[in-house]
Amino acid sequence: LMRQAGRHLPEYIKIRQKYKDLMEMFLDPEVIAEISLQPVKRYGLDACILFSDILMIPYASGSDVSFKEGMGPQVKFIEKFKFESHKLDPVTKGIEKIKKVSDTPLIGFVGGPWTTLLYCLFNKEERLQMNKDLINKNKKRIDNHINELTDIVSNYAIQQVNAGIDAFQIFESAAGDLDDYLFEKWVLDPTLKIVKEIKSKSDIPIIGFPRNASTSG
């Protein structure tokens, strides 16, 4: 059984009330460690999920990312990705702090290239109403960025691996928006490249989560 920290925990709410923006919490190693371990301490779970978000890559690539109360994620559109890994040092420090105090296996994660790109190129309404016409209209833009983001995702994954995570998950939450051809091109092929890069550094288990992939096409 796995359970990520969140509003079901009073100890989480106590910390959350101190911050206006979740992003501040995602960039504080002490908070990352404490909140990641809250469900483990309360429920005795068999795995710990890193307290973080799939939008850390846009943040480290030049976008302004915020999580205001009651508004959901707000992401400033970017067309050029300048990934600065040092911006995510607080995440790796949080991982190291967790591993120092807990033997519970720690699961790190990242948003896959396709899902990450959606947040960078499209607004909330477009993401919720993603359709073939919108995808076809933006194919060239997407093609131009998928390979670039595949490398960035691989680098961030290895950053987490080097910090000490025990397993890794790749979230492609928007995989179901694609037909079979584009699913293979923008989700499956990039994921295989990311897995290959991770496996070249570590033999940790890797979990793929292509949401609604069975309904794509």
Predicted regions and their residues:
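Compositionally biased, intrinsically disordered low-complexity regions
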Residues: 8, 64, 72-74, 110, ...
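The substrate-binding groove and active-site-proximal loops of carbohydrate-active enzymes
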Residues: 23-27, 79-89, 143
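Active-site loop segments of alpha/beta catalytic cores
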Residues: 1-6, 87-217
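N-terminal basic, low-complexity leaders that serve as flexible interaction/assembly modules and, when applicable
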Residues: 1-67, 101, 193
